[in-house]
A protein has these predicted regions:
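Rossmann-like NAD(P)(H) cofactor-binding subdomain of soluble oxidoreductases
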Residues: 2-86
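Short, solvent-exposed coil/turn linker segments
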Residues: 10-13, 28, 66, 128, ...
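Soluble or luminal CAZymes and related metallo-dependent hydrolases
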Residues: 31, 104-108, 161, 165
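Short, surface-exposed, polar/charged, turn-prone segments marking secondary-structure boundaries
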Residues: 38, 51-54, 75-79, 97-101, ...
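A broad detector of the eukaryotic-type serine/threonine protein kinase catalytic domain
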Residues: 44, 121, 147-150
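Rossmann-fold dinucleotide-binding core
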Residues: 55-142
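Active-site-proximal catalytic alpha-helix in oxidoreductases
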Residues: 130-155, 160-167
Length: 167
């Protein structure tokens, strides 16, 4: 176990005339409706919505931008809060990323690759992230429900519960 502190530059407000080469939107799914109007009004061209919200098509429609300017990504990590800090597990540091229902344009892929150039962060491109996110949720929700039922101790899961996770 290693303790690290990362300082990532973030903003807490986005004015309509602010411009960024890439805008990474990292909010909880329940917060998205509040930030979408701000993002839509902004003049930046390329947006990457990172998270597990299975509504990529609806977000794309709301943003009213060309499909090749909006990406959806899922960070390959997990974690929990413990004593006021975040304990994270990294499963191959990187992100699965792509368009809502079609592959990203070559220009967008190059822009993303350039942003992570010189890092160990691996990008895996997927052509239909709306599908990918829905499949991920269908796979992970049963595991989450059993986790909650066992108070986080999966060794207490019954045979029936374990079977439901992978059925």
């Amino acid at each position: 176990r290693r303790t690290t502190t990362e300082r990532v530059k973030t903003i807490d407000a986005l004015a309509p005339d602010d411009f960024y080469d890439l805008v990474f939107v990292v909010v909880q799914a329940g917060q998205l409706p509040d930030v979408l109007p701000v993002l839509k009004a902004n003049r930046s061209q390329y947006f990457v919505f990172v998270g597990n919200d299975p509504h990529a098509k609806q977000v794309l429609e709301y943003m009213q931008r060309p499909a090749d300017k909006i990406a959806f990504g899922f960070q390959n990590s997990a974690g929990h809060r413990e004593h006021g800090r975040v304990v994270s597990a990294h499963v191959g540091v990187g992100m699965t990323v792509g368009g809502a229902t079609a592959p990203l344009s070559g220009a967008f892929r190059i822009r993303l690759k350039t942003a992570f150039d010189g890092t160990k962060y691996k990008l895996t491109f997927y052509s239909d992230m709306d599908e990918w996110l829905k499949c991920h949720i269908a796979f992970i929700l049963p595991v989450c429900y059993v986790c909650y039922a066992c108070n986080g101790d999966l060794t207490r899961a019954t045979r029936q519960q374990r079977g439901a996770m992978i059925d």
